[in-house]
Structures are given as structure tokens and as C-alpha cells.
Amino acid sequence: MQTVLIALLRFYKLAVSPLLGSRCRFYPSCSDYAREAIQYHGAARGTYLAARRLCRCHPFSAGGVDLVPPPNSDARNAPHEAEASSHRL
């Protein structure tokens, strides 16, 4: 399944993306993020992470660097942990 999804992403990047132009507000681009997420996390979780990323990529988003979370991290708790550690004295 991973191979099929990555092949579809490669097709999009080579055939469709050049026609639309560069519109992604993030680094890496959404298609590169999706490929990395699928490679690191597998088809199911990688697709979920890619879908969340696509929902964040819109004209009102600030964009910036948004890397795929490491395979052993729980991305849902990461912002809360960072926020809690910044409030400690």
C-alpha cells in the first residue's frame, strides 16, 4: 500500500504540480511531507498526518517549517509538552 501511495504522490509531483505552480506555504512541500510521513509512519498514520497537514495549508496560514514528527513521538501531545515546559520557572 505504501508503494502505491508514494507512486501516486510522485505522479502528482511530476505531472500535476508543475501545472498548478508552487502554492504550498510550508517547508517541506505538502507532497514531500506526505511522502516522508508515509515512509516513516506507514500508510495509515502517514496518510492521516498528510491529511492534517493539507488542512493546515491554506491562504490564512502563516506557513513555515513543519517537519514530519519522528516515528516514536506522539504528535498530539507535543504542543502541550512544549507549552508546559515554557511555563516552568
Swiss-Prot record:
Organism: Burkholderia mallei (strain ATCC 23344)
Start-end of Basic and acidic residues biased regions: 77-89
Stated name of the protein: Putative membrane protein insertion efficiency factor
Cellular-component GO terms for this entry: plasma membrane
Family that this chain belongs to: Belongs to the UPF0161 family.
Domain of life: Bacteria
SMART domains documented for this protein: Haemolytic
Keywords of this entry: Cell inner membrane, Cell membrane, Membrane
InterPro entries in the cross-refs: Membr_insert_effic_factor_YidD
Task performed by this protein: Could be involved in insertion of integral membrane proteins into the membrane.
HAMAP family documented for this protein: UPF0161_YidD (MF_00386)
Entry's localization field: Cell inner membrane
Span list, region Disordered: 68-89
Pfam family, one: YidD
UniProt membrane topology term: Peripheral membrane protein
